[in-house]
Amino acid sequence: MNPDQYSQAIERLNAWAHAYYVLDAPLATDEEYDQLYHEALAFERQNPERIHPASPTQRIGGAPLEGFQKASHLERMWSLEDVFDFGELKSWAERLYKQFPHATFVCDPKFDGASLNLLYEEGRLVRAATRGDGLIGEDVTQNARTIPSIPLSIPLLERIEIRGEVVIPKEDFEKLQEERLRENESPFANPRNAAAGSLRQLDPAITAKRKLRFIPWGVGAHPFKTGSFFEIMKSLESYGFIRSPERTRCHNIHEIERVYALLVSERSTHPVMLDGMVVRVDEIAYQRELGYTIKAPRFACAYKFPAIEKKARLLSITLQVGRSGVVTPVANLEPVEIEGAMISRATLHNFDEIKRLDVREGDWVSLIRSGDVIPKIIQPFAHLRSGEEKPLSRPTHCPECGSELLVEEVLIKCQNLSCPARIKNSLIHFASKKALNIDGLGEKIIEQLFEAGLIKEFEDLFSLTKESLLSLEGFKEKKAQNLLDAIQGVRGCDLWRFINALGIEHIGEGAAKKLSHAFGLAFHLQNHEAIIGLEGFGEEMAQSLLEFCRVNHERIEHLLGLIEPLAPIQLTPQDSPIAGKSFVITGTLSAPREHFVELLTSLGAKVVSSVSKKSDFLLYGESAGSKLEKARELGVRCVNEEELGEILES
């Protein structure tokens, strides 16, 4: 094989792979593909300097990884607002029509898999990252390169983020499950978990065997000038990506509803697991004008499928004690399959709900599950009772520690701060992804450490030794050292993570970030007036925070010394040239919008969504729309990132 023949072989192999994996229309037999593949591979081994970057031999390579690096998205990967019926869809659309009465929409199936963000630069795939928290994910580029439906190169030289869902078709999922059972491995709970787990394999060779597919559903940062989302997605198809055959452009909500009804009817027979339909405004200019709420874009929603209802046997009801002391009844079920997931537990919410439903141990019950929602019992089949079913009495004492329970309206709470269940669940929260994110310290390991008497409170984690870990079942030298390194690695974490990790009732991630920005390391030293003055803080949140900080003052100080969290850089108002100023942000900037919102608010500025005469500044990036024009008309000072930097340095 000479160089010209090699180039032709690579072109032919990629065309065959595209026809097989993307178009589902094979152009060659497996034997023909394998023969040409090995001829190309032989040429590459003899001429390593001539290896083509798009060669299929380059998809799988590299040693197994020790772990995944973090990767920032150029633009945030947002969650979507959910709508559950036609009435909610109509309300969502009517809000849009008030601003843009002639808006059109694009409807896509919502695939139930693992979201992935592909970054291409100068036509080459340079990074693939998981969604993560929407701003920062994990770099899984080596694994993504093994997925045949992800082009290693595209005919677009400008930088672009292409977003989509990594899925396993139902048929391939069943084969994977059978294979795992033959190998005495635990089966996956559902295709989504299988896709996510496959994408996060440290060994790319394992990922390559999993029959993953990448189906694009959108873009992040991009250079397109077209005014249509639908046309952008058509461009991706021309680059070699899979087309969603059900993608439809709609002109009103009745057309949207017809597409939705069709998808619902095809739900069980569709080759890939679906959990709804995504509806987007097609016009890019309208999308920019509509913008985002704190959590989601205003120009798109997820129209969820109806819950699937199944009949199941309720074997028993157990009582769980959470970190706040709330005792929750949980139904243990005879396992039943719903949408590829084996369900063996369901929530009963509280004891008033049990009384209302008249659910008893041993009942046959009607069970529903919708998307990621925890399975829920909606009614018992009373006519099927044999008389042996047992009603559950409302408990008076904690099932874990035996202390007397307190009734607070519909909730029943254990007040014992030393209750083992409360401590364990507090530790689990402390180490969780939304808190200190201690890798390798999950629920089972915490349970093991707790039962062995090695940890009883947060501080004990920092006193663990390799010797104490090696005495536990399942711990070898490397696993013990990795856990110790992960625990020590939380030193210097963001302050909001530290605050969230404390598990203060009513204080979640969002509130923790506000406290971090407003007060820094003195968050626990504030009075009622200061706390209640924060946006979004009500009386209940303020009282909960103040009481927790009063009771745990010394402990917070000790933990601050141990963990040394980093507070956002704060300038006092007199130091900040933009303190008290009002900002509007528009266009595509070099970092996600949230980065600039946090920067500006930390410097005493206020960020608002719309331009008015009262606006002091408009910060604009590329493709700034009508907000920039309006700001100039109103005489609002318009600055780009470079000019903002000059203002802050002045």
UniProtKB/Swiss-Prot annotation:
Q: Report residues binding NAD(+).
A: 30-34, 79-80, 108, 131, 165, 304
The record, for PANTHER family, names:
CHROMOSOME TRANSMISSION FIDELITY FACTOR 18 (PTHR23389), DNA LIGASE (PTHR23389:SF9)
InterPro entries per the record? BRCT_dom, BRCT_dom_sf, DisA/LigA_HHH, DNA_ligase, DNA_ligase_AS, DNA_ligase_CS, DNAligase_adenylation, DNAligase_N
Protein name (record)? DNA ligase
Q: What is its EC number?
A: 6.5.1.2
What cofactor does its activity depend on?
Answer: Mg(2+); Mn(2+)
Q: Where is the active site?
A: 110 (n6-amp-lysine intermediate)
Q: Which organism's genome codes for this protein? A: Wolinella succinogenes (strain ATCC 29543 / DSM 1740 / CCUG 13145 / JCM 31913 / LMG 7466 / NCTC 11488 / FDC 602W)
Q: Which UniProt keywords apply?
A: DNA damage, DNA repair, DNA replication, Ligase, Magnesium, Manganese, Metal-binding, NAD, Zinc
Instruction: Name the family.
Output: Belongs to the NAD-dependent DNA ligase family. LigA subfamily.
Family matches, as PROSITE patterns: BRCT, DNA_LIGASE_N1, DNA_LIGASE_N2
Single GO MF annotation: DNA binding
Q: Does the keyword Zinc apply?
A: yes
Query: Record's superkingdom?
Result: Bacteria
The record's annotation in HAMAP family points to: DNA_ligase_A (MF_01588)
Residues binding Zn(2+), per UniProt: 398, 401, 414, 419
SUPFAM superfamilies, from UniProt? BRCT domain (SSF52113), DNA ligase/mRNA capping enzyme, catalytic domain (SSF56091), Nucleic acid-binding proteins (SSF50249), RuvA domain 2-like (SSF47781)
Q: Which reaction does it catalyse?
A: NAD(+) + (deoxyribonucleotide)n-3'-hydroxyl + 5'-phospho-(deoxyribonucleotide)m = (deoxyribonucleotide)n+m + AMP + beta-nicotinamide D-nucleotide
General function of this protein: DNA ligase that catalyzes the formation of phosphodiester linkages between 5'-phosphoryl and 3'-hydroxyl groups in double-stranded DNA using NAD as a coenzyme and as the energy source for the reaction. It is essential for DNA replication and repair of damaged DNA.
Cellular component annotations (GO), alphabetically ordered: cytosol
